[in-house]
Amino acid sequence: MSDLRITEAFLYMDYLCFRALCCKGPPPARPEYDLVCIGLTGSGKTSLLSELCSESPENVVSTTGFSIKAVPFQNAVLNVKELGGADNIRKYWSRYYQGSQGVIFVLDSASSEDDLETARNELHSALQHPQLCTLPFLILANHQDKPAARSVQEIKKYFELEPLARGKRWILQPCSLDDVDTLKDSFSQLINLLEEKDHEAVRM
């Protein structure tokens, strides 16, 4: 190899090193997804979202109307619209569904039979709603740290999720504020579903 070619090769390698070290540019922006978070009052929606945002638990106040939180993850930002779960609020939930790309449904796995039945009815309505039925769902069986908590298998059977959600993208996960790692993993799985739906839309 001639001296000229050797010099050119070294110059090109120097250029590549320079590009790698000095010209990286800003990191690519994380994708953002707009989600709606629903569930009965007392299910723990606000506390779970506040934990993910590293907010002090002392400042947590139950949501009466709606609130929006930007929940950051390494590979995405979730803009979560949390809706209050009181009786007089739930009838207005559907007004806030438009534009959602995914759904988080939080239930109290240690609740009374009456409340659990109400939660089941609300989840069934959400799964079948025209604006939500094609979206990924993350269903969180919260308060697993309580003695009366029902298992994920019990929740799945009682809520009739297998037949009702067949063909849909959904995840049912246990959670509690005592196990933040499992909570974060649940949201990571939801992000994977959101990304899959994005990729399918691009291919179409």
From Swiss-Prot:
Protein origin, superkingdom: Eukaryota
SUPFAM superfamilies recorded: P-loop containing nucleoside triphosphate hydrolases
Cleaved signal peptide residues: none
Listed Pfam families: Arf
Protein's UniProt keywords contain Repeat: no
Keyword Nucleotide-binding: yes
GO MF term list: GTP binding; GTPase activity
Binding site for GTP: 39-46, 82-86, 142-145
Keywords assigned by UniProt, alphabetized: GTP-binding, Nucleotide-binding
Family note: Belongs to the small GTPase superfamily. Arf family.
Entry protein name: ADP-ribosylation factor-like protein 15
